[in-house]
Amino acid sequence: MAARQADLAITYQPQVHFFADEGLPLVRVGTLINSPLNTVIALDKQIKTPADLQGKKVGYSVSGIEQATLATMAQHAGIDPASIKLVNVNFQLTSALLAGQVDAVIGGYRNIEAQELKLQGKTPVVMNVEDYGVPAYDELVIVAHRDAIHEAKIRKFLTALQAGVGYLRAHPQKSWEAFAAAHPELRTELNHQAWLQTVPLFATDPAALDKARYETYEQFLYNNKLVKKVTPLTNYAVQLH
């Protein structure tokens, strides 16, 4: 994207903040999923809230942001983040949890890993990060090069995306059948459940920008020393209405 080899790209809102901190000319122009998907998941029924993670082992895959997220949840619950033992499970979140290697995991998505565990007959305890002190953010966003954000084709894309999302939300099962027919190798019960869980999370107005949400999350990253400075919102996010 920075080299103008594509017009648009899909990424995560936290990554947009990191790009801005590095001085890359990438700007958020639209949103696909306007809710966090990240969760803390446990199978132990004694774990109901982050407060119950004191003295427990929590598996993670991505250092930095997941550690800051878990620490924030712990502080929100009134426990010392240092009382939680973090274990790197190398993206094997579900298997580590099922094998009892950890008491809980962070980084599992509410629309994927939580559904996978249910399909295996488990009853996971799912804690959404934004319910425990972590600022809400957009999970999936669309970025463009700063020099291209006012090109007409980007506005046209966002208009078409809004229409597509409207159809998707109005016809979740019908759209799933069309997708599965086009990609039969992906017709699994997990993908079906993930599809149905994800559809309500698509942004109904992809171009809309919640400025306060982005500024709050930027401050969260700065407070946790994940970015070197607080970058002005206009440097990395716009609303093209």
Each model region followed by its residue ranges:
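C-terminal solvent-exposed extensions
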Residues: 217-241
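Secondary-structure end/capping motifs
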Residues: 150-226
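Class I S-adenosyl-L-methionine
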Residues: 20, 71-75, 118, 180, ...
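Short helix-capping segments at alpha-helix termini
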Residues: 76-81, 120-122, 152, 185-186, ...
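Short, glycine-/small- and polar/acidic-enriched structural segments
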Residues: 1-80, 85-90, 94-99, 103-111, ...
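Short, hydrophobic secondary-structure boundary micro-motifs
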Residues: 28, 176-178, 229-231
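Pocket-lining segment of extracytoplasmic ligand-binding domains
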Residues: 14-15, 45, 92-182
